[in-house]
């Protein structure tokens, strides 16, 4: 099922789409317009400590953030951020540092901290030391509950960090329609990563809750 089929299945009037590049925006925009859906489009970016430091050691301090466009001008700003990450910060994949992001920031954007792969996760569950700098914006934070062993612990860490400072939103990542689709999804991910089902080496892929069915169960859609 396409993401818009899942939105129809859940009877929602808006869709929040987060992608790792801007290549899918135009198709997403046209599809949402055709279905009279409000589109909230976000670019998930890899944050590094220094955009000029392209070493193996620099990758240990990387984490993810999501930048959402509020409007048409925000879309143009997303293009600038993506271009900088692709051409100036590229090291195995697009990257950008907080200083560069700050220079490109505008009031047409919203910064979100994802639940998985964020600096909160990295600092508490890996050996990484990630130091974000939010002087130029007021980020929002996402939490999830997908029945993973660390979900509750990580949610508590997010609560500790955001206490009296930042808004927190409970979210649900959806990658497929039903729980029985999990194996097919995992197979697809393994093919993309050139791994096997016996040893997938994929973080946060030990749960079948990342689906529309689980969302429907939790929120009664």
Predicted regions and their residues:
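Phosphodiester-processing cores and adjacent nucleic acid-binding clamps
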Residues: 1-221
